Amino acid sequence: MKIVIDLMGADHGVLPIIEGVSRALENKSFSVVLVGDKDKATPFISKELASKVEMIHTQDYIKMEEAATEAIKRKESSIYLGMDILKNGADALISAGHSGATMGLATLRLGRIKGVERPAICTLMPSVGKRPSVLLDAGANTDCKPEYLIDFALMGYEYAKSVLHYDSPKVGLLSNGEEDIKGNTLVKETHKMLKAYDFFYGNVEGSDIFKGVVDVVVCDGFMGNVVLKTTEGVASAIGSIFKDEIKSSFKSKMGALMLKNAFGILKQKTDYAEYGGAPLLGVNKSVIISHGKSNARAVECAIYQAISAVESQVCLRITQAFESLKSQSFESQSDQQDA
């Protein structure tokens, strides 16, 4: 298995990415192609690691303040070169750089899976249960039609089943209430269409994401990104509040010591790094979009995520799902019309 790693554009430079690759190679067997500035990367690459990776040198990359459309013009940029390597035989690509550039190039260079109108960013959200919830779209498509959300539901369902190995995953539609009549025009129209699928649970509220009421939560990219960023902010704020309160007295410090294991589990469940990155579903190869501020652990977990996606053949599974499940929807709608 060959995984392409974009070294450029992350908030903390190349070091966390290289450290993450090194840690992953200690636990998994895979080939690595690093794409980026060799002069910046070499000081952090040990002789042992150098023997395990291939390095493609380029100094160009799409900066965060640049438009995503720049990516298609800059054929020597790290993400363009990386996407070409993926297109021509590699199995997966991971980038913590410009997410818009990654999404745009993946769609244009790799192509969409037949039947998919819009690829979507799929992210894992912590829940009170033993397994996380899947949320999509987390930011790829801010303006959506009902048909797009149907695609997101199909892809999220297949990802939960094939990659995460959830039995009979249930899909919920994010709304401002559980009742069928709740929601804006987009939600109401999507709800009518999703009723044709056996996996559809119904509407869910924001709080249900973290209760694990359903396995997959579907929404437009604007709402999904707001949910994601709000969750990150709340988790960070709670962590800061805990730290301040623990330091406030000797009694608090002793209590924290007794609850050390519980705090460790809480941190693991709410730490974005443990979830790796966000798969871009709907394109013909596995692409993982990592957080710009990714540390070594986040990169390591993103690699494991990519390996799982490739081993489970998620792109093929989604292709097959669109052939069979969309047929199920068509037959169901035809039966309703005949009735």
From Swiss-Prot:
Catalyzes the reversible formation of acyl-phosphate (acyl-PO(4)) from acyl-[acyl-carrier-protein] (acyl-ACP). This enzyme utilizes acyl-ACP as fatty acyl donor, but not acyl-CoA. InterPro entries: FA_synthesis (IPR003664), Phospholipid_synth_PlsX-like (IPR012281). One of its GO terms (molecular function) is phosphate:acyl-[acyl carrier protein] acyltransferase activity. GO terms for cellular component: cytoplasm. Its EC number is 2.3.1.274. It comes from the Bacteria. This is Phosphate acyltransferase. It holds the Pfam family FA_synthesis. Keywords: Cytoplasm, Lipid biosynthesis, Lipid metabolism, Phospholipid biosynthesis, Phospholipid metabolism, Transferase. Homodimer. Probably interacts with PlsY. It comes from Helicobacter pylori (strain J99 / ATCC 700824). Belongs to the PlsX family. The keyword Transmembrane does not apply. GO terms for biological process: fatty acid biosynthetic process; phospholipid biosynthetic process. It is an enzyme of class 2 (transferase). Pathway: Lipid metabolism; phospholipid metabolism. It catalyses: a fatty acyl-[ACP] + phosphate = an acyl phosphate + holo-[ACP]. It is found in: Cytoplasm.
